[in-house]
Amino acid sequence: MYMDLEGRKCLVVGAGAVAARKVRALLECGARVTVVGEDPVPALQRLESESLTIRARKFRRSDMGRYSLVVGATDDSVVNRTVSRESRKRGIPVNIVDVPEESTFIVPAVHRRGDLAIAVSTGGKSPAAARRIREELEERYGGDYAVMIALLGAHREEMMTAVPGHRRRAAAWKGILDAGLLGVLRKKGRPAGAALIRRHIRAAAEGEGV
């Protein structure tokens, strides 16, 4: 499940290194983040943003407000359970880091390249394994994949307008990928890739193959 957090209020309880990573990820999603925790680590303090509020103190039940999402990232199991309980009472999705039984959702390890996002989850069984797999994916799916996704997206409206029917469009997209779009981009660049896409769109619009 993907949640659109653009402009939404999120709460992170905890101010350590793990909390800093969670805050950074939320800010990258466009969320407005409030952090509550004692002794914020430097990595957290360096995350300067108009969308970030840091309250350097202990968590209080009164900190629970109208949030779209809550993350508990403290090393205090009592605080984490309180965060989980108070979030559930209010119907707010909550993730307690590395404690799936106290969470209503699990945050996967995510590999991002532009608009490409690949999520890896072990169901909370082994976050370390999920991170290792994500690192392997980072080596395989580099920036050229982001270029390809952006180029496909740039021609999506043209495909929707020119080619009638979901099946014909799906077949056309498959044909573009099968024709080696990624290889064309690597060897000849974006203009050649765009030309390949347009050829397939024209052929699909005319009911022909390439």
Positions of PLM-derived features:
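Short loop/edge segments at beta-strand edges and connector loops
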Residues: 37, 54-58, 98
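Glycine-rich, highly charged phosphate/nucleotide-binding loops
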Residues: 48-65
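ADP-ribose/adenylate-binding Rossmann-like module
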Residues: 69-75, 80-107
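E1/E1-like adenylate-forming module used to activate ubiquitin-like modifiers
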Residues: 96-146
